[in-house]
Amino acid sequence: MSSLRLLISDSYDPWFNLAVEECIFRQMSPDQRVLFLWRNADTVVIGRAQNPWKECNTRRMEQDGVKLARRSSGGGAVFHDLGNTCFTFMAGKPEYDKTISTQIILNALASLGIQATASGRNDLVVIKDDGERKVSGSAYKETKDRGFHHGTLLLNADLNRLADYLNPDPKKLQAKGITSVRSRVTNLVELLPGINHEKICAAIEQAFFNYYDEKVFAEIISPQALPDLPGFAEQFAKQSSWEWNFGQAPAFSHLVDTRFVWGGIELHFDVLHGAIDRCQIFTDSLNPAPLEALAERLQGVEYRPAAIDAVCLQLSDDFPESQAELLQVQCWLAEVLR
């Protein structure tokens, strides 16, 4: 029986692909060497220890239908679209060696006529007339007996959208956690016109087979054709949950303020594990009682517009004389906290 396994996903859902990756990693035989090829439709993927409110323009992402996905490995935030090809190499220890998987990718690029080198923070770079440009970034995960190396290759990604979603709004956000390092990037299509997902995947597959001097048939994975993956439903539920993608954020503080006709309002949020740990309010309103009640009731609530909306609606029932003002506050918070 071959020690190699090749899996290709035809799903563009990041939560599906990351759930498949995690399940295969947990269940693979220690003597296997696995290559998983996949890609995601519009998604921001963040590292395990990152804060999405700090890393991403969450409001713009929601407006444009861009998903947020937290991976189980470390590293920074990246934007994926169908112009990216994603790869994952897995192996048991002591066989696992990220320099081997890096070399396989370099060999694949070289077979297409692209000379790239490994550089710095787990990147692959090429030399252009205007200097060194990144074409691939990677992250890693290791357990006691196995490890994986996954990353992306920029083929024909919409680089303008990187700034749309990876530069957060100036929200007066003071956050603990890891901040992404921004790099100068380029698409491989600028070096090799006509390159696409199918061609780069074929090159990576061949380099994988050549390195180990073995060949296997690909297993095509889709929501309609899942391999036997015990625990997949639970893993997918986790990957797609608000609790995992947002609730795992490190502690942070957020200040928002505005002025209405009836007075100014300033809210200070301390957020822990995606929930409001403390809320302070300052206002020059002539009727501060409803706003003070709001601050008190927001403690312990999930830090997302839907949960805060529910508190505001309940408060309007308790303070009917202030319904108009509370509705304004509700609409404002729904906008600034996205």
From Swiss-Prot:
Q: Which Gene3D superfamilies match?
A: Bira Bifunctional Protein, Domain 2, CO dehydrogenase flavoprotein, C-terminal domain
Q: Which reaction does it catalyse?
A: L-lysyl-[lipoyl-carrier protein] + (R)-lipoate + ATP = N(6)-[(R)-lipoyl]-L-lysyl-[lipoyl-carrier protein] + AMP + diphosphate + H(+)
Q: This protein's superkingdom?
A: Bacteria
Q: What class of enzyme is it?
A: ligase
Residues where (R)-lipoate binds: 134
Task: State where the protein is found.
Answer: Cytoplasm
InterPro entries membership:
aa-tRNA-synth_II/BPL/LPL, BPL_LPL_catalytic, Lipoate_ligase_A, Lipoate_protein_ligase_C, LipoylTrfase_LipoateP_Ligase
- What GO molecular function annotations does the UniProt record carry, in alphabetical order? ATP binding; lipoate-protein ligase activity; lipoyltransferase activity
Q: Which residues bind ATP?
A: 71, 76-79, 134
**Span of domain BPL/LPL catalytic:** 29-216
Single Gene Ontology BP term? protein modification process
Its annotated function is as follows: Catalyzes both the ATP-dependent activation of exogenously supplied lipoate to lipoyl-AMP and the transfer of the activated lipoyl onto the lipoyl domains of lipoate-dependent enzymes.
- PANTHER family in UniProt: LIPOATE-PROTEIN LIGASE, LIPOYLTRANSFERASE 1, MITOCHONDRIAL
- Protein name from the UniProt record: Lipoate-protein ligase A
- Look up and give the organism this protein is from: Yersinia enterocolitica serotype O:8 / biotype 1B (strain NCTC 13174 / 8081)
Q: Which gene encodes it?
A: lplA
